[in-house]
UniProtKB/Swiss-Prot annotation:
It comes from the Eukaryota. Keywords: Chloroplast, Plastid, Ribonucleoprotein, Ribosomal protein, RNA-binding, rRNA-binding. It comes from Oltmannsiellopsis viridis (Marine flagellate). This is Small ribosomal subunit protein uS4c. Residues 91-154 form the S4 RNA-binding domain. GO terms for biological process: ribosomal small subunit biogenesis; translation. Gene3D superfamilies: Ribosomal Protein S4 Delta 41, Chain A, domain 1, RNA-binding S4 domain.
Length: 200
């Protein structure tokens, strides 16, 4: 399944606030569609699990295949599968760039990385799914256009940098200090329902 490229407000009306997906908000409380969406998806156990799974997909900008791969990897690792899954997604380079305020959304962060504007430990990295590690240093290439794009994005960033990261606004350098705590994940969802969805 490919990444979503349709209207973003339609998605957040259905799933709620998704900071990595869009900074836009909506005042409409009904689900999209002529009759406000189907009640089946809201009330059935399957529908609720599907909705939580979709929150992860859209917020982190990943495909169904990628999410399934992360779930399988989380199951092989120590700890709560749901919490480990969130940690794996949060440590993706595109998400770290977004959480540092270097880009307004995960999609924008992915473009920065793909176009060669981001450096990790003094090496240019162009793979958005690159798994960041503790003590990784994320910075901007020493090119005027690269620094300008990040500076502009950072000046309009509204979210605070989470405690597992640190950010120097003057030098445009960020550091991964530790693995993220569950309370710092900027998304309202029940990750256990996502694990249950893939355990069917």
């Amino acid at each position: 399944m490919s990444r979503y490229r349709g209207p973003r407000l339609r998605i957040i009306r259905r799933l709620g606030e998704l900071p990595g997906f869009t900074s836009k908000t909506t005042t409409r409380t009904s689900s999209p569609g002529q009759h406000g969406g189907s009640n089946f998806a809201k009330s059935s156990a399957y529908g609720i699990r599907l909705q939580e799974k979709q929150k992860l997909r859209f917020n982190y900008g990943i495909t169904e295949r990628q999410l399934l791969s992360y779930v399988k990897k989380a199951k092989r690792m120590k700890g709560s599968t749901g919490e480990v899954l969130l940690q794996l997604l949060e440590m993706r380079l595109d998400n770290v760039v977004f959480r540092l305020g270097m880009a307004p959304t995960v999609v924008a962060a992915r473009q920065l990385i793909s176009h060669g504007h981001i450096v990790v430990n003094d090496q240019k990295v162009t793979i958005p799914s690159y798994a960041c590690q503790v003590k990784d240093v994320i910075s901007v290439r020493a090119k005027n256009n690269s620094r300008k794009m990040v500076t502009e994005a950072n000046s309009t960033a509204t979210a605070n940098v989470p405690s597992h990261l640190s950010w120097n606004k003057e030098s445009l350098v960020g550091v991964v200090n530790k693995v993220i705590d569950r309370k710092d994940v900027g998304l309202q969802l029940n990750e256990l329902l996502v694990v249950e969805y893939y355990s069917r």
